[in-house]
Amino acid sequence: MSVVLLDEAIVHYEVLGKGRPVIFLHSWIGSWQYWISAMQVASTSFRAYALDLWGFGDTTHKTTHYTIDQQVALLRSFLKEMGIGKVALVGHGLGALVALDYTSKYSDEVDRIMAINCPVKSGMLHEKMRKISTIAGLVEWISGSAPNVQAALGDATKADLSAIATTVNGGRAGEIFTKANRQHTPCLLVNGRNDPAVSVPDIHQISDFSHLSHQIVLEKSGHFPMIDDAAKFNRLLTDFLALDSGLSPSELQLKDEWRRRVR
């Protein structure tokens, strides 16, 4: 287990591979652990990092640091501590909001973003996320009781419930995406069609996307496409990371596999 001391507190992370940096940021449920397969795939060409945000996994429970602004500050401190320059960000749920907010503030440091099951407008997050009483109950609901998903979320109960509630109830999703969208950083939005927590944006909600933003819907996935359909997700991740810097993710539709899934 690798740790770094930031703001006088322990932050846990894992790293694989060599090359240009990619940072994986987890959702409201779970930790770095469910990224293992994606990290292994990315690490063949990139240096893949995954960290636990404040209040999750083996990172310190620091109740004053649970807002999205504080999670963004954690990411910035981590990148500086690791000596990482321009980076690709792969964020999921909460992690996607952190990645987008980071981009809105430090766009010159972000090469591209993959935002997975991210609420891009207010009201896209299911009301159940705002009424959580136990993490175990939330895991059961969001995983659909799928054994492989539940196994990958084995350390989800390490999280501080307040860390989830603070960001769920922050109500900044629409604002965060709008600000990031103005930066014209290449951004691929990936949605699982069957995600119970975050609704899939419709054509009206994505009509104001930057020309460097693009959406792909994975029809057989829920909230965890990197687990529900790992092979397909990892191919998409590989193709996305392989795009030349500055290219729109819409270039992915040149490949037959993604053409019919484009929104």
Q: Where do the language-model regions lie?
A:
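Active-site loop/oxyanion-hole signature of alpha/beta-hydrolase fold enzymes
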Residues: 49-90, 235
